[in-house]
Amino acid sequence: MHEMGIAMQIVEIAGGAIPSGIENPSVAKVNIRVGKLTAVVPTSLTFCFNIATQDTPLAGAELVIEEVPVVARCKQCGHEWIITGPDFSCETCRAGEVDILSGRELDIVSIELKE
């Protein structure tokens, strides 16, 4: 389960982003974007995040996951579409050469501190 490793990295990065001048910081939310091609299971990541945040300033924080679809552009005709299945062929001209425009993201967008 690679979600635990990802959760631990999120905790490390988000924890490091908390300004040092704040006394007893507490994080309310961590907002992330996860592409479909990362093979991250959102429920598993949330479960692992809740474990990884114990005894940290992120304990009890909500993990908000925005799933990013796989978007491709055909190299032959330039058509762009959202890929929903295993077929990466262009839905317009059926060419097999595509550029992946999105779907590989795994980004921390923001953290929100409790007041």
Swiss-Prot record:
The keyword rRNA processing does not apply. It holds the Pfam family HypA. Zn(2+) binds at residues 74, 77, 90, 93. Keywords: Metal-binding, Nickel, Zinc. One of its GO terms (biological process) is protein maturation. Ni(2+) binds at residue 2. Belongs to the HypA/HybF family. Involved in the maturation of [NiFe] hydrogenases. Required for nickel insertion into the metal center of the hydrogenase. This is Hydrogenase maturation factor HypA. It comes from Desulfosudis oleivorans (strain DSM 6200 / JCM 39069 / Hxd3).
